[in-house]
Amino acid sequence: MGQPAAGSILTLLRVLLLPLGPALAQDSPSAPTPGSPLSPTEYERFFALLTPTWKAETTCRLRATHGCRNPTIVQLDQYENHGLVPDGAVCSDLPYASWFESFCQFSQYRCSNHVYYAKRVRCSQPVSILSVNSFKELESPVEVSPTTMTSPVTSHIKATERQSFQAWPERLSNNVEELLQSSLSLAGQEQAAGHKQEQGQEQHKQDPTQEHKQDDGQEQEEQEEEQEEEGKQEEGQSVEDMLGRVGRAGLRIGSEPKPQSLSLSSDPHSFTARVRDVDSAPMMIENIQELIQSAQEMEEMYEEDAYWRSQNHGSLLQLPHKEALLVLCYSIVMNSCVMTPSAKAWKYLEEETFGFGKSVCDNLGRRHMALCPLCAFCSLKLEQCHSEANLQRQQCDASHKTPFISSLLTAQTMSMGTQAGTSESGRFYGLDVYGGLRMDFWCARLATKGCEDIRVSSWLQTEFLSFHNGDFPTKVCDTDYIQYPNYCSFKSQQCLMKNRNRKVSRMRCMQNETYNVLTPSKGEDLVLRWSQEFSTLALSRFG
């Protein structure tokens, strides 16, 4: 069955939202502060109107195709924030994604990770709107003050940046779908026209012949180079031509480590800030020109194949080099990689043009597992888009012995049958294998490295997102009817019980059940207890 038209989704969503306003307005006699999060009671009513999940999926489909500025989406977001969508960072009740740089980003994260009923909560401490200060090498023309006092000029610049950051990834995402003439496109000509109108409003001060440029204050040299590129473009340019332009940009990736917490999946806007504001190339894919090569090698190829030809002037082909590369990573990271047309085009290019073939291997000796038609390729690309190392694709040979599937892909699709554990009768024991390693390894690493270890936290996050069921899908309950303050404390208890030959599984949290609710301090005690027991066990075996 084909996807419903954009107008049908809009009509359906308006019907769904009809009772929303009065329901939330009756919550309390005193008027809540505009822009503040809903109370738990208000959220129960709010989510009740988005239940069952197909209703939430409908709103997500609309958000994905129209963006956060669609009037119906704006109305929905206003309901969730007492009439005013906040401008700046927000916090959530998700244990491993506790804050986001905008409410739009938070909403998109809920949709892309299928955690439809995650709640916005009050932040325990102020969070800066842009996290560029966390990058030591960042050389931004605008300094972000550590205090709350800013000059009117600085405030205006920050507001402009925030506006462009919110709109830019949405435009890129639509552009890549438009470029590839996706059969998965949900909007058609009517949506494209509406989206271009939104872009025109945001860039009303720009010359009409320069609509593809963004209000980010790029240097004059880059603007001139961009104009020269546009002059050379012809109507028959293909996806390969665009990728070749990315290769000619000669992007080089630095080797200094970056904070792992600022990953593309949880912080796309901070990532775009790095690409837009830093003169040095972003740390994304080492030696990207080796993957993409130059346009001269591809000009004569596949001209006969209409599937790879774009009939639209502009779009992604007119973006600057860095953005053209970023859109590929953004597209596969913020959507389900195995279903995106950009991933299919990228895979085709590497297999046929660059001669890598069907098998996917990297320079770490790993052979990415083809659990589905695009799984192996997406596993590699998601790792490359997030990688802090010089990760490159290689021709597969006998040296690539380690079977591997990226946890980033597992978190996206939740369909890796050989990795994901079984979920029966509302219970979930955990992932059978993560990163090629079984639960015993991860329990040991949790005991020795703690919850904050990068690899441990990635394992915990993937497992947490692998099971969302019950009346409170973001809460963590087990088969002993204990409710945990976070997933790490539950996993510590599960590892402890496993060591004692007792099986404890995660169980859906139900409204009509009674649970022993643990405090955060009790949760920390469980983590410490497992660490101590593991240390004792290790000493007794090897001491």
Swiss-Prot record:
Specifically expressed in testis. Residues 1-25 form the signal peptide. Residues 26-106, 319-427 are annotated as: Pro-ACR binding. Residues 187-239 are annotated as: Disordered. It holds the Pfam family PBP_sp32. GO terms for biological process: acrosome assembly; fertilization; spermatid development. The N-terminus is blocked. Phosphorylated on Tyr residues in capacitated sperm. Residues 26-276 form a propeptide. InterPro entries: Kazal_dom_sf, Proacrosin-bd. PANTHER family: ACROSIN-BINDING PROTEIN. This is Acrosin-binding protein.
